[in-house]
UniProtKB/Swiss-Prot annotation:
Gene3D superfamilies: 3.30.465.10, UDP-N-acetylenolpyruvoylglucosamine reductase, C-terminal domain, Uridine Diphospho-n-acetylenolpyruvylglucosamine Reductase, domain 2. GO terms for biological process: cell division; cell wall organization; peptidoglycan biosynthetic process; regulation of cell shape. Residues 16-186 form the FAD-binding PCMH-type domain. Cell wall formation. This is UDP-N-acetylenolpyruvoylglucosamine reductase. Its cofactor is FAD. It is an enzyme of class 1 (oxidoreductase). Belongs to the MurB family. Keywords: Cell cycle, Cell division, Cell shape, Cell wall biogenesis/degradation, Cytoplasm, FAD, Flavoprotein, NADP, Oxidoreductase, Peptidoglycan synthesis. Pfam families: FAD_binding_4, MurB_C. Pathway: Cell wall biogenesis; peptidoglycan biosynthesis. NCBIfam families: murB, PRK00046.1. Its EC number is 1.3.1.98.
Length: 345
């Protein structure tokens, strides 16, 4: 095997100094299949990557990084709305901006979420009351071994909170090539979270929602270009109402969001903040001083520094609230993705 010599610093938003044996760029489906088969034939591990905004490299990757750069935005207008067919390699935030400029509304709450369009279904990205599943029409997937295209409806994607079938059945050997999005012409602003609740639903415009979301994200989340991070490190935990009520008795101002099934979603950042961990540092990694949900590469951190910090944060929250936080970020070891919860346990 070739030595690990190609830097991945610019391909992971934590800006960790890790490397790979090889990096290949695929801008067509044929190229994706070809590079996958070449790497697989040499018995090397292969990792499909978008913009590396939701991964933590624990160490050097001993194989090929395959960058999915399939582009293109096709828009079809119908009487009730717009149907978009978007290449997996398109930047998500740029798509949100583009639709707004075209007078197409519905993606404003998802502004400034980092990463590629193809990564959006994997996590079922969401923010400020909207998730991808609310606007997703279908996902196109490529079976890299058979060379066949698979068309999945929204239901078949099995979307959940930061969850989808792409983390399970289609995790390895498949590449998302395009995402279908349907946006209704009848615009109903979702103004339930943060500063959006201050806006008047009767007069607010899509541009104002977009601007407000961008302002909120920029004010509390560090720019990965300046400070290495992967955004929200942990998922917001969902607990029983009984568990939430027991915490509420001691912390009556705790933010909580009742779910359709009767359970309650809590704010992971708030839980971490109650443990007085903002600014806490281990090795080169630290908890961000403004947003406790974000772990940062403060000073030439290694992957192991971020793991140690995440484990410490998780243990503190568990000790105080009897809640086990789950990472939202995907953990990548030398030969591929590993179970993040097992790494932290």
């Amino acid at each position: 095997m070739a030595p690990s010599v190609i830097s991945l610093r610019s391909h992971n938003s934590f800006s960790l100094s890790v490397s790979a044996s090889c990096i290949k760029v695929a801008d067509t489906q044929d190229k994706l299949i070809e590079e996958w088969r070449v790497a697989s034939a040499s018995q090397e591990p292969v990792l499909l990557l978008g913009e590396g905004s939701n991964v933590l490299f624990l160490e050097d990757f001993l194989g090929t990084i395959l960058l999915n750069r399939l582009k293109g935005i096709d828009i079809r207008e119908e009487s009730d709305g717009w149907y978009l067919h978007v290449g997996a390699g398109e930047n998500w935030h740029q798509l949100v901006e583009y639709t707004l400029k075209c007078g197409i509304t519905g993606l404003e709450n998802l502004a400034l979420i980092p990463g590629c369009v193809g990564s959006a279904p994997i996590q079922n990205i969401g923010a400020y009351g909207i998730e991808l599943q609310h606007v997703c029409d279908y996902v196109e997937l490529l079976d890299l071994t058979e060379g066949k295209t698979i068309h999945l409806t929204t239901e078949e994607c099995q979307f959940g909170y930061r969850e989808s079938i792409f983390k399970h059945q289609y995790r390895y050997g498949f590449a998302i090539t395009a995402v279908g999005i349907f946006l209704k012409k009848e615009w109903n602003p979702v103004l339930n979270y943060g500063d959006l609740a201050k806006l008047n639903p009767a007069t607010v415009t899509p541009q104002q929602v977009f601007d407000s979301v961008c302002h909120m994200r920029r004010s509390k989340l560090p720019d990965p270009v300046v400070t290495g991070n992967a955004g929200s490190f942990f998922k917001n935990p969902i607990v029983t109402k009984q568990h939430a009520d027991s915490i509420l008795r001691e912390y009556p101002n705790m933010p909580q969001y009742l779910q359709a099934d009767g359970n309650v979603k809590l704010a992971a950042g708030w839980l971490i903040d109650q443990c007085k961990l903002k600014g806490f540092q281990l090795g080169g990694a630290a908890v961000h001083e403004q947003q406790a949900l974000v772990l940062i590469n403060k000073s030439n951190a290694k992957g192991s520094d971020i793991v140690e910090l995440a484990r410490y944060v998780r243990n503190q929250v568990a000790a105080k609230f009897s809640i086990q936080l789950e990472p939202e970020v995907r953990f990548i070891a030398a030969h591929g993705e590993v179970n993040a919860i097992e790494v932290l346990s």
